[in-house]
UniProtKB/Swiss-Prot annotation:
GO CC terms: extracellular region
Name this protein carries in UniProt: Snake venom metalloproteinase Bco22
Function field: Snake venom metalloproteinase that impairs hemostasis in the envenomed animal.
A GO MF label: metal ion binding
GO BP annotations listed: proteolysis
Post-translational modification: Contains 3 disulfide bonds.
Subunit comment: Monomer.
Tissue note: Expressed by the venom gland.
C-alpha cells in the first residue's frame, strides 16, 4: 500500500 511505501521511504531517510 502507498502508506507502507511512505513509511519505508521515511525509514531510509532516518537511517
Amino acid at each position: 500500500t502507498p502508506e507502507h511505501q511512505r513509511y519505508v521511504e521515511l525509514f531510509i531517510v532516518v537511517d
